[in-house]
Amino acid sequence: MIKIDNVKKFYTDKVKIGPLDIEIPKAGFTSLIGPNGAGKSTTLLMIGRLLDMDEGQIQVANMDVSESKSKDLAKVLTILRQENHFVTRLTVRQLVGFGRFPYSKGRLTKEDEVIISKYIDFLDLTNLENRYLDELSGGQRQRAYVAMVLCQETEYVLLDEPLNNLDVARSVQMMEHLRRAANEFGRTILTVMHDINFAAKYSDKICAMKDGQIAAFGTVEEVMDSTLLTDIFETRIEIIKGPYGPIAVY
């Protein structure tokens, strides 16, 4: 479980995130949605300890994020930021291998190599594993980064806008991979999403944010509400109930 207790982040006297209070259940897929500036990425970065909170406490798997040792936290939690600066002379396999660093400290074992191959195959990268990152398309490179974080084999996986710069087909492919990771590997996946309908189709829970606050948290059916989403996004949003679940029309 990810437990966020009275967490606040201050930027100026007028701009702040929180107080945030939420418990995200273990296993499954949870999406953070909301307009730009709502605090989604800030919240994700605080959970991943890439950004300090000013008040409150965050626990992941009963570990205090602020107090835990990095080497211990790295075996429980991994995070992929929206922007990643890659080394061009790095192959896909070498990149994915970085996911094993918390365990091997750079000295890959035979077991590590098996795990690396597992996630390269899982993300359909086998034919690309010896290609350099600068030879890949944006979608292929994004899959390589996701393979790297999954290769870390942490129970909790945080992803900041994993569909960034992906077209519709590649976005569907990515979401199907992440959904499978939650189902087949029992991962707890928390991701920042801009597309409401992708969040609705693939998530178990949705957390909607506005103005640094949690506006709603619940099942897809609970959050996919016309009145609620219209207020959050400040534009008219209609919800259509269909055979594949609720769809937002705006």
Swiss-Prot record:
Gene3D superfamilies: P-loop containing nucleotide triphosphate hydrolases (3.40.50.300). ATP binds at residues 34-41. It is a peripheral membrane protein. CDD domains: ABC_Iron-Siderophores_B12_Hemin. One of its GO terms (biological process) is iron ion transport. InterPro entries: AAA+_ATPase (IPR003593), ABC_transporter-like_ATP-bd (IPR003439), P-loop_NTPase (IPR027417), Siderophore_ABC-ATPase (IPR051535). Residues 2-236 form the ABC transporter domain. Keywords: ATP-binding, Cell membrane, Ion transport, Iron, Iron transport, Membrane, Nucleotide-binding, Translocase, Transport. GO terms for molecular function: ATP binding; ATP hydrolysis activity. PROSITE patterns: ABC_TRANSPORTER_2. The keyword Methyltransferase does not apply. GO terms for cellular component: plasma membrane. Disruption phenotype: A mutant lacking fatE, fpuC and fpuD ATPases is deficient in petrobactin import in iron-depleted conditions. Its EC number is 7.2.2.-. The keyword Nucleotide-binding applies. It catalyses: a Fe(III)-siderophore(out) + ATP + H2O = a Fe(III)-siderophore(in) + ADP + phosphate + H(+). It is found in: Cell membrane. The complex is composed of two ATP-binding proteins (FatE), two transmembrane proteins (FatC and FatD) and a solute-binding protein (FpuA). Belongs to the ABC transporter superfamily. PANTHER family: IRON(3+)-HYDROXAMATE IMPORT ATP-BINDING PROTEIN FHUC, PETROBACTIN IMPORT ATP-BINDING PROTEIN YCLP. Part of an ABC transporter complex involved in ferric-petrobactin uptake. Probably responsible for energy coupling to the transport system. This is Petrobactin import ATP-binding protein FatE.
